Amino acid sequence: MSRTLASVRGLAGLALLGLGLVGFKTETAVVGSPVADFRLRDVNNKTVALADFKGAKGFIVVFTCNHCPFAKLYTARLNALSRKYQPLGVPLLAINSMDTVVYADESFRNMQLRAQIEKFTFPYLHDARQTVGRNFRAEHTPQTYVIWRENQQWKIKYSGAVDDNGVVPAQVKNPYVARAVDELLAGQPVTTPQTDSFGCAIFFRKQL
């Protein structure tokens, strides 16, 4: 583990443990596994599905939320990733799978307000039934996946953190998501297909 990532984790733990929110990835969807299409409502009250993006080569899928301090640290970086890669055929989709019963801040209305205030350049989708989060086995916010079109299927090519420094963007040494997308666009295998994610734990309601 790099010293920077260790220090970031330490800061995250101190800042978030008191809220019962901190968590680190223990198990997630397997890199290389297929991803089924989904259809979710965005903050503009439109339904969005992978199939809607004709000609997309892949997607950056980010599980995020409204209240998490770590998720808020990445807003500008997610906007930048969207601006850079959507024109190249790799849109970014942000998904909120947080339980609105546990966290009132995660209401759809608050999602709309956050997207407006922070000027999201990407769709912000409400996973009201938490189905998509479960399918990806997402555990934290922010947690990212790069999925790519392969043999008529969407497959996970990267899973983990956006980069290696949540606190100080200028000190990022490993832009994991950007590097993975660049390698895939160049027709190369992803050199780092999986990393640890860190942030606030996603609480899933018990399935009936």
Question: Where are the regions that the model predicts?
Answer:
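Bacterial N-terminal signal peptides that target proteins for export
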Residues: 1-12
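Loop/turn elements at helix/coil->beta-strand transitions in domains of secreted/extracellular proteins
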Residues: 56-59, 88-92, 119-123, 141
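Structural microenvironment flanking redox-active thiols in thiol-disulfide oxidoreductases
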Residues: 72-117, 128-135
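Short, thiol/selenol-centered motifs that function as redox-active sites or metal-ligating centers
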Residues: 65-74, 144, 200-203
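Short, internal strand/loop/helix patches
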Residues: 112-156
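Short active-site neighborhood of thiol/selenol oxidoreductases, capturing the structured segment around
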Residues: 51-72, 181
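Non-globular targeting/processing and membrane-anchoring segments
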Residues: 23-55, 161-208
